[in-house]
């Protein structure tokens, strides 16, 4: 399609006069005169050149001014919305419907602005190329356009990421504070409550991958933002960007943020970026805050025969991959991770799982580790961890991981062969790992191999290319043809945790997105496989097998919305007819089979399903559960399942038992009296225990502070014990002193044991989110009683002896006399304790 026709079709009517006047600029080029066969020199003069440049500059000013005004208008709306969320009083006055409508308008405007920028930017590039092609005798206008684009930072951001993050924050506010029916689907809203996986590695998952054209990327992000918040990298991540929850759903807009020139400007700019403030009126206003999407670099390993590539492409179960990965520039000394991943796929269910070995490396040790099988870094790291008090089991596991990867590199003769760089945007509900959407854009593949011994691309003695990672502006401009490949689309991946053998969860918005014209599904797509195929696929010496999706890259994946809608309708009708046939077959099978056999088969099926779910949810065996299974199966064989009133009450949220018993209680009698239907299982986790454990720091500190206080009491009692015991010979009552020393000694032991036991008990209750009381009064009461009794005994014995001496029962001539004022008090105490 000609660009002029595309521009006319994609123009947003209310903004029609603000687009580039492409047809007028074409007329100024006198294209028709050139096509008539006249000489370019005769028909094109300096005056024509000046008129064209002046018109081009005016069009730039017009488009840029309009774009700035609209962008700032959206910013003002977002500022007003954010202002209404800053205090509790303002939040109470918010009209949720009006708030949501304004937010929808901002998202819609941002989406239209992105399309506006793309169309106009493409128009300016094409008209400049047309000028240089038609009038080669005149200086190229490309350099002029480059200068003007730096002065007028038009379309400098490849994506409106800062706007999207602010909108995402406001959508999250709306979801959290208002039960709006259109804000998020009910199924998605309940996901965070039902998800109880504390670690993604504990469950299998399904992965769905799609290609997204650059023209549709903004609309795709806008659709996702209505249901999932964007995950903002508050800092440079240093762990697994796929599974570690190292992200914050927060927007940190810096008022003095600078401008970031996007990748489209790189075709015109040698340095690839520019920083500039833009003055509007009398005050400076930030046009594009910096993007939060991190640049991830991955260095893949393989051997001369590309065995890892072939094994992965042929879907050999357990085929491993090895990669080095870091975020940002290597000169900034980021955390570098060496990762060995082994994916396994269940061919029956389609579920995927993986095992991963991850080592954090230092750049200066990588060469010796990879090429010389040097264990010095392993020994250095283990010694450091041992000095810090790391447990022996962890050190042994770390040593095994080092040996595993080193042996893998040596046995397979691996070396770095391919570099992939991309920007990642992630969408996920914080704390809920059941569904996650990532979009990787600006994907670039670069050869990093030394397969050709005569002309190696990478120094064979170094693990990475020094020319790319050097401290020079835009080092990619030095790449030669054939050394790099730009992937034309963005890659969207939807990862869904499988709690059973079901297919993709019934999220309507996901179905609408994945079946729309905006995305093109590519099952089993892999960044590594695509990179090897694009850079090494033409050389039969290296690669003889290619991925099935390569031919699709030669076609335009964009679809007509109407055609995509009709195709989706046909697909849904076909699926519905298949489901109807299957349901009919199930009904017929139930009628034809006797009741007893049907019940027995259904019971076996339910038990198998329950075993599968137990494998996903509980990784610890239980003897009690093992002995109870035969009893449950016997009950199933003796009864035929009926959908009774109690089950309907459960679904309705009413009284869940007709006899007053709770079928979900721990009582085995009441639980066995109620039989759940197929596919419904007894909950094993409370909703309050779903998700990761998040307890305020003051709770942990209070428990530790109490333990420390008990330790101080234990220390004081031990000092008292040994002081008394060491001074027994000097005491006036040696037997009493000896007895008290032993009493205090046992009291000291009790305090230490009691303190540690209480600390562990409270720690368990805190981690388990238990509602039980944390008080433990027995210990303090017992210590207080023992101390009081010993003091009273010591006091009584001492004063009895003093009374005897005072009354002449013992020779007291050597005792000093008391003042006359204290004599009545002494007599009272003597009478109280007796003689």
UniProtKB/Swiss-Prot annotation:
Cytoplasmic side: 1-709, 757-778
One of the protein's GO biological processes: vacuole fusion, non-autophagic
Ranges of compositional bias, category Acidic residues: 617-626
GO cellular component: autophagosome membrane; cell cortex; cytoplasmic vesicle; endoplasmic reticulum; endoplasmic reticulum membrane; fungal-type vacuole membrane; vacuolar transporter chaperone complex
Vacuolar side: 728-735, 800-835
Residues recorded as bearing Phosphothreonine in the entry: 183
Subcellular location per the Swiss-Prot or TrEMBL entry: Vacuole membrane; Cytoplasm, Cell cortex; Endoplasmic reticulum membrane; Cytoplasmic vesicle, Autophagosome membrane
The protein, known as: Vacuolar transporter chaperone 3 complex subunit 3
Species assigned in the record: Saccharomyces cerevisiae (strain ATCC 204508 / S288c) (Baker's yeast)
Gene this chain is encoded by: VTC3
């Amino acid at each position: 399609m000609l660009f002029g026709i595309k521009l006319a079709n994609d123009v947003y009517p209310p903004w029609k006069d603000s687009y580039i006047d492409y047809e007028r600029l074409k007329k100024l080029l006198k294209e028709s005169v050139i096509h008539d066969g006249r000489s370019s020199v005769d028909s094109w003069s300096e005056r024509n050149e000046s008129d064209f440049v002046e018109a081009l500059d005016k069009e730039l000013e017009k488009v840029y001014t309009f774009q700035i005004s609209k962008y700032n208008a959206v910013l003002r709306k977002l500022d007003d919305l954010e202002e209404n969320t800053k205090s509790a009083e303002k939040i109470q006055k918010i009209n949720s419907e009006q708030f949501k409508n304004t937010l929808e308008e901002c998202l819609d405007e941002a989406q239209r602005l992105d399309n506006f920028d793309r169309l106009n930017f493409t128009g300016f590039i094409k008209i400049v190329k047309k000028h240089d092609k038609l009038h080669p005798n005149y200086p190229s206008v490309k350099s002029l356009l480059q200068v003007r684009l730096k002065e007028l930072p038009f379309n400098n951001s490849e994506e409106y990421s800062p706007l999207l993050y602010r909108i995402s924050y406001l959508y999250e506010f709306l979801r959290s504070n208002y039960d709006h029916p259109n804000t998020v689907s009910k199924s998605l809203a309940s996901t965070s409550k039902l998800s109880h996986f504390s670690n993604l590695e504990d469950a299998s998952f399904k992965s769905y991958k799609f290609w997204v054209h650059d023209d549709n990327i903004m609309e795709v992000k806008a659709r996702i933002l209505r249901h999932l918040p964007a995950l903002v990298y508050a800092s440079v991540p240093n762990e697994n960007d796929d599974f570690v929850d190292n992200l914050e759903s927060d927007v940190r807009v810096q008022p003095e943020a600078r401008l970031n020139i996007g990748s489209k400007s790189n075709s015109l700019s040698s340095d690839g970026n520019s920083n500039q403030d833009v003055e509007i009126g009398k005050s400076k206003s930030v046009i594009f805050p910096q993007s939060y999407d991190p640049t991830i670099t991955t260095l893949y390993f393989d051997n001369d025969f590309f065995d890892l590539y072939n094994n992965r492409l042929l879907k050999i179960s357990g085929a491993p991959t090895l990669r080095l990965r870091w975020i940002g520039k290597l000169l900034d000394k980021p955390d570098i991770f060496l990762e060995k991943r082994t994916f396994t796929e269940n061919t029956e269910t389609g579920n995927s799982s993986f095992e991963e070995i991850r080592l954090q490396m230092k750049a200066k040790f990588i060469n010796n580790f990879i090429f010389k099988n040097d264990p010095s870094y392993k020994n250095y790291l283990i010694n450091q961890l041992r000095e810090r008090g790391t447990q022996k089991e962890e050190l042994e596991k770390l040593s095994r991981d080092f040996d595993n990867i080193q042996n893998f590199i040596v046995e397979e003769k691996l070396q770095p062969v391919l570099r992939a760089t991309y920007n990642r945007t992630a969408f996920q509900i914080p704390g809920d790992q059941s569904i996650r959407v990532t979009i990787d854009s600006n994907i670039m593949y670069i050869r990093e191999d030394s397969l050709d011994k005569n002309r190696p691309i990478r120094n064979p003695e170094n693990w990475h290319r020094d020319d790319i990672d050097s401290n020079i502006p835009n080092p990619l401009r030095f790449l030669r043809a054939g050394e790099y490949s730009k992937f034309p689309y963005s890659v969207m991946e939807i990862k869904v945790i499988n709690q059973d053998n079901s297919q993709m969860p019934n999220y309507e918005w996901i179905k609408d997105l994945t079946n729309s014209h905006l995305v093109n599904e590519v099952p089993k797509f892999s960044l590594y496989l695509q990179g090897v195929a694009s850079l090494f696929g033409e050389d039969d010496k290296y690669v003889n097998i290619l991925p099935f999706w390569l031919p699709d890259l030669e076609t335009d994946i964009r679809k007509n919305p109407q055609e995509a809608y009709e195709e989706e309708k046909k697909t849904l009708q076909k699926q519905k007819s298949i489901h109807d046939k299957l349901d009919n077959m199930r009904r017929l099978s139930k009628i034809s089979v006797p009741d007893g056999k049907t019940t027995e088969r259904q019971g076996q099926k339910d038990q198998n399903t329950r075993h599968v779910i137990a494998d996903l949810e509980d990784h610890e065996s239980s003897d009690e559960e093992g002995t109870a299974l035969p009893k449950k199966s016997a009950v199933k064989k003796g009864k035929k399942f009926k959908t009774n009133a109690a089950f309907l009450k459960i679904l309705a949220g009413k009284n869940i038992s007709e006899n007053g018993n709770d079928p979900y209680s721990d009582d085995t009698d009441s639980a066995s009296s109620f039989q759940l239907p197929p596919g419904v299982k007894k909950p094993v986790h409370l909703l309050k225990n779903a998700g990761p454990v998040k307890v305020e720091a003051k709770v942990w500190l209070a428990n530790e502070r109490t333990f420390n206080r008990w330790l101080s009491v234990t220390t004081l009692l031990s000092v008292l014990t040994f002081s008394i015991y060491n001074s027994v010979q000097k005491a006036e009552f040696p037997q009493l002193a000896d007895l008290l020393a032993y009493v205090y000694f046992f009291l000291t032991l009790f305090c230490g044991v009691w303190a540690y036991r209480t600390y562990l008990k409270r720690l368990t209750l805190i981690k388990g989110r238990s509602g039980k009381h944390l008080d433990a009064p027995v210990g303090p009461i017992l210590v207080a009683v023992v101390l009081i009794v010993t003091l009273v005994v010591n006091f009584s014995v001492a004063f009895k002896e003093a009374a005897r001496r005072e009354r002449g029962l013992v020779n007291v001539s050597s005792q000093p006399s008391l003042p006359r004022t204290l004599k009545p008090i002494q007599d009272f105490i003597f009478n109280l304790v007796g003689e």
